[in-house]
Swiss-Prot record:
Lineage: Eukaryota, Viridiplantae, Streptophyta, Embryophyta, Tracheophyta
HAMAP family xref list: ATP_synth_beta_bact (MF_01347)
Keywords, alphabetical: ATP synthesis, ATP-binding, CF(1), Chloroplast, Hydrogen ion transport, Ion transport, Membrane, Nucleotide-binding, Plastid, Thylakoid, Translocase, Transport
This protein's name: ATP synthase subunit beta, chloroplastic
Gene3D superfamilies: 2.40.10.170, Bovine Mitochondrial F1-atpase, Atp Synthase Beta Chain, Chain D, domain 3 (1.10.1140.10), P-loop containing nucleotide triphosphate hydrolases (3.40.50.300)
Binding site for ATP: G172, G173, A174, G175, V176, G177, K178, T179
Originating gene: atpB
InterPro entries in alphabetical order: AAA+_ATPase, ATP-synt_VA_C, ATP_synth_F1_bsu, ATPase_a/bsu_AS, ATPase_alpha/beta_chains, ATPase_F1/V1/A1_a/bsu_N, ATPase_F1/V1/A1_a/bsu_N_sf, ATPase_F1/V1/A1_a/bsu_nucl-bd
GO molecular function, one term: proton-transporting ATP synthase activity, rotational mechanism
EC id: 7.1.2.2
Length: 498
């Protein structure tokens, strides 16, 4: 960690004497720069191109050195549009990698890849900054204990639990509740773990980024009245940005998260939406730099790039970074090198189902498709493991029987199968839950359900003790006691109607 100005601040004026080059060639977002002999910048150094365009407007473009070409030339990738740049323009070597603001000042704000605020809320305190390129924590610093990261969301904690300091892949199409699930996790980590979150929008649609920001303000995750009370920092590198920005915005978000973990000793949630866009941007940059493409046209350095990002996301003795990454699967081909490389790093997968969303069951997490390496008796305990397996068996049997029910009806099933179907429908509804961040829309107060309560509830349903209760009593409640109370209310209401 260092206390210094950011690369986008007054540092440039102090460094003008230091190391000056000039632009020799521009091909889209890639620049070749000539420096005096013996004054070559290092790989990953930030360069700043300064000058004026044809209309006399000030131009300032930050680039990152990617290759040393020989003959005092370097090749750099621009972090913003290169419109208006011409050959011969002055280039200043800042002498250091890109550095971005970190710490409490970043909460509630939106940044670009350079760590500059883009939300029109004024400047950010840049006294504490950190370089975006760092090595992963050493083995001796790592916390190797396998611990569950309790989210307070029943379906996640029971069937596909997250690992503290782990990486989770979030799979789901448009409109199945990915954003609401993300916001609920941000809210719950702040309340239950006293932690903060960092959201990295990598190659997002600008509209989606704006929608997320507005929804966060509406739900209180970002506190407009007192910005320091906010629970999240946002870093966006949108679809319209050059590939250099999209390739590095994930590292900017990760750097902010690392500060909260290492210095503030907090549990941090890091969201990356979408990890595929990070790979895609790397592929574009690789082609622009003239590297020979590898399988399916991807960059030959795909595994290395992915590893350098993913290995920094981990638990140390100070705190943890738990990462939730939205994964786009091109043409639904799971063997594509981009998702295949991502899978190697994931500890759990949360799959959102359009079928469940259509039934009105939220969160629409598919209980049978979602997986976790943590769901082992040696880690979660025999009780949790047994309950989760029995819940999955019941739901699987219900799924198998659905075709028969559709053709012949429930009456043709055996007594045992009818009981299984009834319990499975209760389980399906009990896996739904009212969210704190959705209170504004649903009108029902959000519920955080501890792991012990979750296990107790599902054990009661499986044991048959609650067979007499109507299935709608289990819909959108917190713990099992609320379901029994709701059943009594439903009974009273039906009597009054009669």
């Amino acid at each position: 960690m260092q206390i210094n100005p950011t690369t986008s601040g007054t540092a440039v004026s102090q460094l003008e004497e230091k190391n000056l080059g000039r632009v020799a060639q521009i091909i889209g977002p890639v620049l070749d720069v000539v420096f005096p002999p013996g004054k070559m910048p290092n790989i990953y150094n930030a360069l700043v191109v300064k000058g004026q365009d044809a209309d006399g407007q000030e131009i300032k473009v930050t680039c990152e050195v990617q290759q040393l070409l020989g003959n005092n030339r370097v090749r750099a990738v621009a972090m913003s549009a290169t419109d208006g740049l011409t050959r011969g323009m002055d280039v200043i070597d800042t002498g250091a990698p890109l550095s971005v603001p970190v710490g409490g000042a970043t909460l509630g704000r939106i940044f670009n890849v350079l760590g500059e605020p883009v939300d029109n809320l004024g400047p950010v305190d840049t006294r504490t900054t950190s370089p975006i390129h760092r090595s992963a924590p050493a083995f001796i610093q790592l916390d190797t204990k396998l611990a569950i990261f309790e989210t307070g969301i029943k379906v996640v904690d029971l069937l596909a639990p997250y690992r503290r300091g782990g990486k989770i892949g979030l799979f789901g199409g448009a409109g199945v509740g990915k954003t609401v699930l993300i916001m609920e996790l941000i809210n719950n980590i702040a309340k239950a773990h006293g932690g903060v979150s960092v959201f990295g929008g990598v190659g997002e649609r600008t509209r989606e980024g704006n929608d997320l920001y507005m929804e966060m303000k509406e739900s209180g995750v970002i506190n407009e009245k007192n910005i320091t009370e906010s629970k999240v920092a946002l870093v966006y590198g949108q679809m319209n940005e050059p590939p250099g920005a999209r390739m590095r915005v994930g590292l900017t978000a990760l750097t902010m998260a690392e500060y909260f973990r290492d210095v503030n000793e907090q549990d941090v949630l890091l969201f990356i939406d979408n990890i595929f866009r990070f790979v895609q941007a790397g592929s574009e940059v690789s082609a622009l730099l003239g590297r020979m493409p590898s399988a399916v046209g991807y960059q030959p350095t795909l595994s290395t790039e992915m590893g350098s990002l993913q290995e920094r996301i981990t638990s140390t003795k100070e705190g943890s970074i738990t990462s939730i990454q939205a994964v786009y699967v091109p043409a639904d081909d799971l063997t594509d090198p981009a998702p295949a490389t991502t899978f190697a790093h994931l500890d759990a997968t949360t799959v959102l189902s359009r079928g469940l969303a259509a039934k009105g069951i939220y969160p629409a997490v598919d209980p049978l498709d979602s997986t976790s390496t943590m769901l082992q008796p040696g880690i979660v305990g025999e009780d949790h493991y047994e309950t989760a397996q029995r819940v999955k068996e019941t739901l699987q049997r219900y799924k198998e029987l659905q075709d028969i029910i559709a053709i012949l009806g429930l009456d043709e099933l055996s007594e045992e199968d009818r009981l299984t179907v009834a319990r499975a429908r209760k389980i399906e509804r009990f896996l739904s839950q009212p969210f704190f961040v959705a209170e504004v829309f649903t009108g029902s107060p959000g519920k955080y359900v501890g792991l012990e309560e979750t296990i107790r509830g599902f054990k009661l349903i499986l044991s048959g003790e609650l067979d007499s209760l109507p299935e709608q009593a289990f819909y959108l409640v917190g713990n099992i006691d609320e379901a029994t109370a709701k059943a009594i209310n439903l009974e009273v209401e039906s009597k009054l109607k009669k």
